Amino acid sequence: MDLSRSPYNSINIHIGAHYSDKEATAKRFCEAVDRLSPAVRQRLTVENDDKESLWSVPELVESVHDEIGMPVVYDALHHQFSDRGLTGWEALELAVDTWPDGVRPIIHYSEPRRLHEADPSVSPRNHSDFVAGPIHTHGHGVDVMIEAKMKEQAVMQYRQQHPDH
C-alpha cells in the first residue's frame, strides 16, 4: 500500500467476542496488536459492535484505546444495540476524542432495513439499501462512511437529497 501509515488509511476491525471474560479478552487483544508490525498497528481502528453482550464505545475506549492508543470508529447503527446508557452524541464524542491530532475521525452511518420496509421478519441489524438521514455529526469534522446495500448509489442519492452535507 502506498498510503500513509495512519488511522486515516485504516484497517477497521471488531473484537467481536469476549469469551465470558471481557477484561481478559481485551488484554489478549491488546497483546496481539502489540505483536503486529508498526505498519499494521498504525493503521488499525476498532469499531463498536451491534450486540448488547459485545463491545460498546465506552468499553473500547477504556479497554483498547486507553491501553494501546487505537482509535475507535463510532458506528451509529451498532450503537443502538449496545449504547450502555449513552446517547449517540455522547458515544460519538468519546470515539472522536480517541483519534490523533491531524487525523479526521471516521464514523459509520447506516439505517436498519426495517426503517424503510414494513417487514417485521427483517432483522433490525440488517442494513437498508439507501439512507434517508440526515446524518448528525454534532459539529465534528469527521469522515462519514455510509454503509448501505446499494453502495455508491446510496451515497449519490444521499448527496442529492442533502446537498449541504
Question: Where would I find each of the regions flagged by the language model?
Answer:
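Active-site-proximal loop/turn and secondary-structure-junction residues that shape catalytic pockets
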Residues: 15-19, 48-52, 76-80, 111-113, ...
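Conserved, mostly hydrophobic/aromatic
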Residues: 44, 75, 144
